[in-house]
Amino acid sequence: MNSATTMSASVLNYQILKFFPPQKNGFLKSPLIRGKICRFCVSASSNELNKQVIEDPKEETQEKSDGVIVNSTEEEEERSGENSTSTGPSTVLDNKELKKAVLKTASTFAPRASTATKNPAKPGTVLYTVFEVQAYASMLIGGALSFNLIFPSTEPDIWRLMGMWSIWMFTIPSLRARDCSKDEKEALNYLFLLVPLLNVAIPFFLKSFAVVWSADTVAFLGMYAWKLGWLQKER
């Protein structure tokens, strides 16, 4: 009897297993586990989305910062351009101020008329010619004295000293006394201030009257060529 029941039970179990085979991954295929796995996948995907959303603003901020940097560089270039354009008027103002200072200094120390009268030494008059002859004659005589050709001496004396200063004492004042053009007057004003500086500075390096007179002559010709535009006219 027992053997019959055991055989019937085994046959029943075999039929049950035949119709319902055991699932190897039954634990993973249970609805509870499936729900947890789905939740885990959803949470993982949502974290990735959050990371992407967080990373995108960083890229946008970088792009914005790059744009700010570009804009700042453009602003700096514009400012530098404005500064470069603003240097032009400043140099013009500096030149005007320099001319005013030179004119004021020269008019203060150079000989001038005591009263406000018209200059009679106009071009074509006898007085105009006298001033010109006096100016260039004093320059030539001063050169001869500086080179020790007139009143020669072996030692420095008053004649050679006067020859060294002849351009500043006689030539420039005689030319300024004429009714000359504005450019020539400006050149003479510059020379009236430049020649004393040369006469004082050169003897510290070369104690020679001839060298000082030669430097004054070169400065005289160079200033006239610059202010009157001799080189430009030749070109």
UniProtKB/Swiss-Prot annotation:
It is a multi-pass membrane protein. It comes from the Eukaryota. Disruption phenotype: Susceptiblility to the late blight oomycete pathogen P.infestans. The chain crosses the membrane at residues 131-151, 158-178, 188-208, 211-231. Residues 53-66 have a biased composition (Basic and acidic residues). It is found in: Plastid, Chloroplast; Membrane. GO terms for biological process: defense response; hydrogen peroxide biosynthetic process; positive regulation of defense response to oomycetes. Residues 53-92 are annotated as: Disordered. GO terms for cellular component: chloroplast; membrane. Disulfide bonds: none annotated. Its main location: plastid. Residues 1-43 form a transit peptide. Keywords: Chloroplast, Membrane, Plant defense, Plastid, Transit peptide, Transmembrane, Transmembrane helix. PANTHER family: PROTEIN RESISTANCE TO PHYTOPHTHORA 1, CHLOROPLASTIC. Plays a positive role in the immune response to the oomycetes P.infestans, including induced oxidative burst and enhanced expression of defense-related genes. This is Protein RESISTANCE TO PHYTOPHTHORA 1, chloroplastic. It comes from Solanum tuberosum. The lineage of its organism: Eukaryota, Viridiplantae, Streptophyta, Embryophyta, Tracheophyta. The gene is RPH1.
